[in-house]
Amino acid sequence: TVGDLWPLYLENGKPKRKDAWKPRYRADLEAMAVPGGEKKKRGQGVTRPGPLYPLLALPLAGVNEDTLKGWYDREAEAGKHQAARALMMFRGFLRWCAARPEYRSLTDRDAGKAAAIVESLPSNTRRTDALEAAQVPGWWAGVEQLSNRTASAYLRALLLTGARREELAALTWANVDFQWRKLTIADKGETTRMIPLSPYMAQMLATLPRVGPYVFASTGKAGRITDTRASHAKAL
């Protein structure tokens, strides 16, 4: 079954010319196939199965355009972009199987590329809001001058840490360790990761008012910063 081969793929399917998966990507591969049913670390209830988990029970020879289309349509109901990312990862698995003589005859390498599936994928829009290296000094100076000090610190912290917007917006004071200079950031899934807290950023965060559990607090309903587009536009 796919479930028998998936661990072998994780162990041996590293990209060409590389010694190993990138740790973050390897973790994402594992998360995509978890069975779920575990108690959530945050909030109530149990975790959902990973998008790829339903495919693990299939025999490799049973993975074809029809089975993948049915699987993708079901997963897309929970989230199109997550389902699309899972599909891209599974394509890598099929390529790996097709490249191995012992699995080649059982593998439909192009099952995930069928027109019926590709036409259902969400369109990828090229980002136009990314900063070029030459723009950073001017952008930084503009952000520093913002009257909203919380928005100013938040925007600079995004650039300094490389964290996702929602991850950083949800940062609480309990997850800021000024003594050991680190931040604990909640990932998309149920995991966390550590980010070093530079002296500059530590000083910047220390100037923010502690008016609630969130570092980047707001008077809005969420209690934390949610939309900085207006402040960002002023800095540009």
Regions found by a protein language model. Give the residues of each.
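Hydrophobic (often cysteine-bearing) scaffold residues that line and stabilize catalytic clefts
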Residues: 2, 6, 22-25, 29, ...
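Basic/aromatic-enriched alpha-helical hairpins
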Residues: 2-77, 93-95, 120, 234
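Residue-level detector of conserved, well-ordered beta-strand and adjacent loop positions
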Residues: 69, 140, 186, 198, ...
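Basic, Lys/Arg- and aromatic-enriched nucleic-acid-binding interface segment
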Residues: 19, 75-91, 99-170, 179-180, ...
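Active-site/catalytic core of tyrosine-dependent DNA strand-transfer enzymes
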Residues: 31, 38, 93, 130-137, ...
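Solvent-exposed, non-membrane alpha-helical residues enriched in polar/charged side chains
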Residues: 7, 11, 73, 137-140, ...
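A structural signal for short hydrophobic beta-strand segments in well-ordered beta-sheet cores
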Residues: 174-176
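Bulky hydrophobic/aromatic "packing anchor" residues in well-ordered structure
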Residues: 6, 68, 111-115, 139, ...
